[in-house]
Amino acid sequence: MRSLFRLYLFIMGAFIILVMTGEPSVLVHATIPEEITPLVKSKEDQKIAYLTFDDGPSTNTMDILDILDRYHVKATFFVKGNEEPYAKQCYKEMISRGHEIALHSYTHDYSIVYRSTESFFQDLNRLETMLEKEYGVKSRIVRIPGGSNNHLRHQVTTRPIINGILQQLSEKGYIYFDWNIDSTDGISPSISEQQIITSVKRGLKDQKHVNILLHDINSMKNTVKALPDIIENLKREGYTFDTIDETTPKIQFK
């Protein structure tokens, strides 16, 4: 019996050694079938809407911010210099709610802003100084009053000034943005809520990136009324929302 037991131990030991010293085991790497690999769209392929509000803060700003909050949408505010007590709170709310503050002008007075290239940058720098000192905001994103192809650019006396402004903006490291959809709300306070909504809808034209011009002005109450419908329609059309920064595809008039 002892001999048989020793033989059994010998055989089992030999088997274990064979297993341990045999061919190395094959490592199997799990792979995700190609058909279920998630597809991630690049930013260029996505439908993105940039809601932009010029000329604020105004007495409408808080209502605009509340609507944006309700729809979980972030926007870009091209602001003026406004040092009224209510405006100071508006700047703070824009920042705390995650919106982008960009540069428009301090005065928005064409007779000052477009008097000369030097006058433009004095006005712009005044706005920059206020925003940085009071709110810690630094921005290199600019929308010049009236846009880069405004009516003054077509006048012989002011065309060189505006061309010089655009050139120096680039040289100084700013990025200027125009728009590719005009809501028409800036034409007059009498522009109706429905006209504003329709102008935005018509402007979409299957564009993937839409930069929508809206205004944040005391008298433009219909912009506030139109905003929920504008957002809802953009969502139905498959747009997501983003704010403008240095990486945003440029939209500039030619």
PLM region spans:
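Active-site beta->alpha N-cap acidic-glycine motif
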Residues: H29-S119, D123-K138, N233, T240, ...
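Catalytic domains of cell-wall/extracellular-matrix polysaccharide-remodeling enzymes
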Residues: H108-L213, I217-N233, E246, F253-K254
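Terminal accessory/targeting
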Residues: M1-Y50, D66-A75, K133, N180, ...
